[in-house]
């Protein structure tokens, strides 16, 4: 057993007390990103090593791997702790997104180590989508590079408000303060163009030598700020979803027998209580919450992030992909939207193309109407393009086959974020973040016969996994 873990368990008075203490620690999800070879994997390895999160057998294996694949001479190559793929070790780079977990006495952490090469930018966007904070590594010898700008923009585009600019490899520039100050000034000049109200901090460090990672550096006495670990332990993460209106995307209709009908999913934002009036979109039908069922039994109230099953007092038509919200909330379904897109496919995105899109539990089709612009990552300017290439980022106008209950992504990432799926290969080809909503033509002018409506209701009630569209909502809209 890890000696530090054993000591923590002993200090808490046993395994059970230690596990209870762990449950009450706050959780910080963060990612490391930046240009290739800036030392992202080495930094994570250093964090794990210096917080004593590495077991003895892992340390022994690391010594052996450093001899075979290491790039640091006689020193331990800490990057090998997270570069797990054979291709990564052979090339000395990160390709896939690697997740690692560790904890200190103050906080629990989930780390996403993302690739630095431009051709793996799509992997980086995947890692950033669930994080609260981004560590942007900059090689002290190279300064701010294009990929640094790209990752900064993607991080903020995906809603990350806390950026820690870690100026790495200070040992290779003699730990000079003027180098740190110059890069800091360059990045702040660039950051003026980034969207949102950002919390940006700067830490000079050496991941290889351990300077200012978990302990203060004796080589940079001119720096009086916190270490990287201290920043991670103390940064105040205010999750906006806790303060947002209630949103509950239905992922599954749970009907184990004739006496029970519940709607399972994860509460995306806000809270819900037993007895609360709720509304179902896109139909607009209202009911009230009879029970909140969880793995641990019934609850009176549930908060954002909890996986629950809601039982309603009325037997109404709800299927996978529908959205439940408070009855007094207004959210008009929309068929047209402007979407910030990170394109991840070799074939460019162009007007006239159609893709399947998935939003929370809802899956439908969408058509690309126009590309307003592509972002030039070098200077964040907008330029006109006819198509969006691989790793391109731009604003795209889309029309959905049916009205969707959408939020602006910056307000609610779950109900404002979607993915593009190729209809032939079923491969995810892009990620989208809702920027603007256009409610015109939210409901198509289509008339259905009484038989069609009855058959549709029957299919939706007894075969919810078919994801049949609610034709009744279309009829009301047409009327």
UniProtKB/Swiss-Prot annotation:
Its EC number is 2.7.7.4. Keywords: ATP-binding, GTP-binding, Nucleotide-binding, Nucleotidyltransferase, Transferase. Residues 206-208 are annotated as: G5. Residues 34-41 are annotated as: G1. Residues 25-239 form the tr-type G domain. Pathway: Sulfur metabolism; hydrogen sulfide biosynthesis; sulfite from sulfate: step 1/3. GO terms for molecular function: ATP binding; GTP binding; GTPase activity; sulfate adenylyltransferase (ATP) activity. GTP binds at residues 34-41, 113-117, 168-171. It catalyses: sulfate + ATP + H(+) = adenosine 5'-phosphosulfate + diphosphate. SUPFAM superfamilies: EF-Tu/eEF-1alpha/eIF2-gamma C-terminal domain (SSF50465), P-loop containing nucleoside triphosphate hydrolases (SSF52540), Translation proteins (SSF50447). GO terms for biological process: hydrogen sulfide biosynthetic process; sulfate assimilation. Residues 113-116 are annotated as: G3. Residues 168-171 are annotated as: G4. Belongs to the TRAFAC class translation factor GTPase superfamily. Classic translation factor GTPase family. CysN/NodQ subfamily. With CysD forms the ATP sulfurylase (ATPS) that catalyzes the adenylation of sulfate producing adenosine 5'-phosphosulfate (APS) and diphosphate, the first enzymatic step in sulfur assimilation pathway. APS synthesis involves the formation of a high-energy phosphoric-sulfuric acid anhydride bond driven by GTP hydrolysis by CysN coupled to ATP hydrolysis by CysD. Heterodimer composed of CysD, the smaller subunit, and CysN. This is Sulfate adenylyltransferase subunit 1. It comes from Salmonella paratyphi C (strain RKS4594). The lineage of its organism: Bacteria, Pseudomonadati, Pseudomonadota, Gammaproteobacteria, Enterobacterales.
